Structure formats: C-alpha cells, structure tokens
C-alpha cells in the first residue's frame, strides 16, 4: 500500500508521486506517516521532509507551511522546498556561513529574529544534503 504525496510551493510542484512513508517536521515535532494514517491538518516547520520509496530515503528541505493528511493522500503546501540532491553543497555552505555572520552582527529584536530564521533555513539546506 502506498501514499500519494504532493509537495507544492506557490510557484511550482516539487513532488507528485506515490511513496511508502514520510517523516515530516511539524511545529510540534516530527511525525511519521504510513498508509491509513488518521486524517490531520498540521503546520509544517522549517526542516527536513524524509520520503521513503523503494527502500531508499530522499531528503527535501522544506521552509514552513501546512500539510493535510487523509485517505492516503498527503498534500504539503510550503513557502519553498528543495530536494537534497538539487542543492549545491558549496553554495549551501556559503549561505550558512553568511547567515551565521549576519546573526552575530544583528542588532535589535527584529534583526535577530530575521537572522535566526535565515540561519534555520541555511542549516536545513545543509542538513538535506548531508543526511544519510
């Protein structure tokens, strides 16, 4: 038995295919979804979406949004998403270093919040590449 997974951003469809299982980062922690999962709607946090198909795991960096799960259908609408295999490791590492530097230079509450958010996004992209 499989799940139909659709990952969407405002600009494009990132993934639309059958999968065996997913592990999704939500605002209240990670959840695993197998076929016949109870219906839920949940907020998606910045983090890694793990997708299992044919015994292998695919990693995807997702940048927050919403998910609806029910009747073996999963629809995930996120601000942005990238497959780990599509991320340039050197560019991701540079972005992480810039985000860390910007956080250390941030002044005021708003700049600190924005810098922390940019750092979380950058770490997620690096993690999507390096996760085994």
From Swiss-Prot:
Q: Which UniProt keywords apply?
A: ATP synthesis, CF(1), Chloroplast, Hydrogen ion transport, Ion transport, Membrane, Plastid, Thylakoid, Transport
Q: Which InterPro entries is this protein grouped with?
A: ATP_synth_F1_dsu/esu, ATP_synth_F1_dsu/esu_N, ATP_synth_F1_esu_C, ATPsynth_dsu/esu_N
Plastid is among the record's keywords = yes
- Chief location bin: plastid
Give the bilayer topology: Peripheral membrane protein
Can you name a GO cellular component term?
proton-transporting ATP synthase complex
| Pfam families per UniProt | ATP-synt_DE, ATP-synt_DE_N
Q: Which domain of life is it from?
A: Eukaryota
> Which first-to-last residue range defines the signal peptide?
none
Compartmental location:
Plastid, Chloroplast thylakoid membrane
**Any one GO molecular function term:** ATP binding
Q: How does it assemble?
A: F-type ATPases have 2 components, CF(1) - the catalytic core - and CF(0) - the membrane proton channel. CF(1) has five subunits: alpha(3), beta(3), gamma(1), delta(1), epsilon(1). CF(0) has three main subunits: a, b and c.
Name the HAMAP family on file: ATP_synth_epsil_bac
Its family?
Answer: Belongs to the ATPase epsilon chain family.
Known function: Produces ATP from ADP in the presence of a proton gradient across the membrane.
Q: What is this protein called?
A: ATP synthase epsilon chain, chloroplastic
Q: What is the lineage of its organism?
A: Eukaryota, Viridiplantae, Streptophyta, Embryophyta, Tracheophyta
Originating gene: atpE
